[in-house]
Structures are given as structure tokens and as C-alpha cells.
């Protein structure tokens, strides 16, 4: 039975076909940075920020008053889930192929033709996920841009503001963890600045742990300057033999330049989402720090909870007697629950 979109005629749900052309993962996904925490039928979703604490255990006499552990710090932020659409008009014959693929005994006979219909739509969803994740990491806020390229009021929230975190808690005691670095200065060792960040993360993490990796993601221009800096030339020269194992641990980075040195992993970002003179530092393996929440489709069935929440949706609707519309959509929001553990440098 066709799903009904609000105020429109019947739709046929072809969402399973989105899996036919898998989304290509961006660098942040290959690193395993963002985890999917929730699939919700609500239009507003809740993110929790937990700050762990450590209690000191003192030596006491047996039978003496006992010590008690404190409570964990927790804050919540309510964020609207932005909704995105990408449609395409196709021929009725293309729809027949979609139906045939879903019902055919031998679907391989039409697979290649169906893939062409889905592939263009899926590339748009790939770009959407990249924008959502990089906006969170680079600009410390949710992604919801309108057609004019401007942030949509009510949907875009700064994470530091949402969790009411004072600048004093942020790296460099600055809003959004902003800082500056001069990679052209050969008299100053950049490692000193990155060591300052490493200590900041350990001090603010609150869990006493040392099992997470520290990553410095760099625009290509900044990475080249670091590679050519007098204090790093030798490190890069001696690194080639270890580069490939590291790539595998970080999800098989194929084209980016990488260096692991003195407890920090430097990675060149080639996505185009980080400017040449920008640098982002953050810890990996921090549980639930980078989250994705997905919302429901814009159909009556989804609104009533009768349609499963998914990462993307695909529907077919007749436009007129000669044309058919393919309607794809997604509802998702990213959140960084520990923004105080991120540094954002500008040259």
C-alpha cells in the first residue's frame, strides 16, 4: 500500500533501493568519528553531555565512616532535526525497472539500469552527510542551510552555547576553542602548541583515561607547511615505513598524507571542507562525543510510527501522465557533546 505524504496523493516507498548504491564514506566516517546514537520519530531530539569524575579513595580504619562516590555531571541539549530533500523526474519506464528489481525472480537483469537511477540521488546524500559532519567539527554547530546558503533560524545551534559551557573550559579559554598558530615561524616549534592541546584534553576529559588517540586534522596548505617546518622535517623523513599500518588503523585513508609523532596523529584533509589555513584537533575513541541522530520521513505512515526510521528515504510519485517523480529525503543532525575537547587553529 502506498504511503501518503501530507497534503498529497499516494506515494510508493522504494527506500530499500537506496542500499543498492551504498553511500561512499567521507574521511570522518572512515575514521569512525561519528556514531549513530538514535533513530527517532520526534522532530526534536535530545543529546546528553556527560562529564565523568574521579573519586579519591583514602585509607581508613575498618569500621570507620565510609566514603561515597560523587555524581557524574550531565547536561542535555534539545536540537531540532533538519529535514532535507532531493528529487528527480524520471520516465515511467524507469519506474517499471525499479518495480521489476524489487519483485523479479532474477533482479540482476535490471540491476545496472536501476543503479543509474539511484546513483545520482545517492551522491546528493553523500554530500549531505559530509556537510553535516564537517559543519559540526569545523564550525562547532549543527548544519541546516537554506537554498540561499544561509543558516536556518531555529535549526542551527552552537554546541558550546547549547550545553552552556564557559569559555574558561574551552581550549585556549576561547569561544569554540579558537587559537592561532604560525607555521611559517621556523624559530617556534609547532609541537609545543600541539602538546599544550594534548595536556588540555587529558585534563578536561575527566575519565583519567589514556586509551584515546589525538588527531590533528589539517588543511592541505597547513599540512605542507608542517611537513616543511625545520622541527618536523626529520620526523617526516623517518616515518614512511610506518605510514601504511597507521592508515589501516584510521580506516584506510588512501590519498591523505599522515604523520604520527609524539602522541599526536597529523592527517591532511582533502575533502575541501577544511580551509588551507585551518587546523582542527580532537580526541578519537571518546565514547558518544560525536553523535548522529536520524529522524522520520515526511509521510503520514512515518508520523504515525508505522514506517521505520532510516538514514534516507526514497519514494515514487506520478507527476503527470508522462512523468514520474523520484523523491528522496533525509532528516539528521550531528552533535558534539564535548566541545571543550576540540581545538580550532587558524594560521
Predicted regions and their residues:
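Charge-rich, low-complexity N-terminal segments
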Residues: 1-13, 193-243
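N-terminal alpha-helical "arm" segments
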Residues: 1-44, 335-347
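Hydrophobic alpha-helical segments and helix pairs
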Residues: 6-24, 152, 156-193
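Short, Φ-rich (hydrophobic/aromatic) sequence segments
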Residues: 17-20, 193-201, 292, 297-300, ...
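Short alpha-helical segments and helix-capping/turn motifs at coil-helix boundaries
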Residues: 31, 198-202, 311
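Assembly/oligomerization interface modules of large self-assembling protein complexes
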Residues: 33-100, 154
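Long, contiguous amphipathic alpha-helices that act as assembly "spine/axial" helices in icosahedral shell
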Residues: 84-166, 189, 193-221, 322-329
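Sequence/fold signature of self-assembling virion shell proteins
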Residues: 184, 229-347
Amino acid at each position: 500500500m502506498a504511503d501518503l505524504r501530507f497534503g498529497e496523493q499516494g506515494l510508493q516507498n522504494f527506500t530499500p533501493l537506496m542500499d543498492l548504491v551504498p553511500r561512499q564514506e567521507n574521511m570522518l566516517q572512515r575514521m569512525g568519528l561519528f556514531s549513530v546514537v538514535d533513530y527517532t520519530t520526534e522532530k526534536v531530539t535530545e543529546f546528553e553531555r556527560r562529564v565523568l569524575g574521579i573519586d579519591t579513595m583514602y585509607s581508613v580504619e575498618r569500621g570507620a565512616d565510609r566514603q561515597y562516590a560523587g555524581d557524574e555531571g550531565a547536561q542535555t541539549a534539545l536540537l531540532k532535526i533538519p529535514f532535507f530533500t532531493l528529487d528527480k523526474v524520471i520516465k515511467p519506464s524507469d519506474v517499471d525497472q525499479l518495480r521489476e528489481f524489487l519483485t523479479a525472480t532474477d533482479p540482476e537483469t535490471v540491476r545496472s539500469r536501476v543503479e543509474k537511477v539511484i546513483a545520482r540521488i545517492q551522491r546528493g546524500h553523500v554530500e549531505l552527510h559530509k556537510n553535516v559532519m564537517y559543519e559540526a567539527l569545523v564550525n562547532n554547530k549543527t548544519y541546516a542551510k537554506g537554498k540561499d546558503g544561509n543558516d536556518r533560524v531555529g535549526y542551527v545551534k552552537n554546541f558550546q552555547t547549547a550545553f552552556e559551557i564557559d569559555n574558561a573550559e574551552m581550549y585556549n579559554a576561547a569561544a569554540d576553542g579558537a587559537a592561532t598558530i604560525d607555521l611559517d615561524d621556523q624559530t617556534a616549534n609547532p609541537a609545543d602548541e600541539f602538546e599544550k592541546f594534548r595536556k588540555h584534553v587529558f585534563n578536561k576529559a575527566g575519565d583519567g583515561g589514556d586509551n584515546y588517540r589525538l588527531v590533528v586534522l589539517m588543511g592541505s596548505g597547513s599540512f605542507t607547511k608542517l611537513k616543511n617546518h625545520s622541527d618536523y622535517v626529520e620526523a617526516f623523513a623517518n616515518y614512511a615505513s610506518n605510514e601504511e599500518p597507521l592508515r589501516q588503523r584510521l580506516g584506510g585513508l588512501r590519498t591523505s598524507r599522515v604523520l604520527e609523532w609524539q602522541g599526536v596523529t597529523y592527517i591532511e584533509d582533502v575533502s575541501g571542507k577544511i580551509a588551507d589555513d585551518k587546523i582542527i584537533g580532537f580526541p578519537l575513541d571518546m565514547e558518544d562525543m560525536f553523535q548522529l541522530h536520524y529522524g522520520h520521513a515526511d509521510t503520514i505512515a512515518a508520523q504515525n510510527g508505522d514506517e521505520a526510521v532510516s538514514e534516507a528515504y526514497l519514494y515514487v510519485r506520478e507527476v503527470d501522465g508522462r512523468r514520474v517523480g523520484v523523491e528522496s529525503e533525509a532528516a539528521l543532525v550531528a552533535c558534539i557533546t564535548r566541545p571543550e575537547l576540540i581545538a580550532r587553529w587558524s594560521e
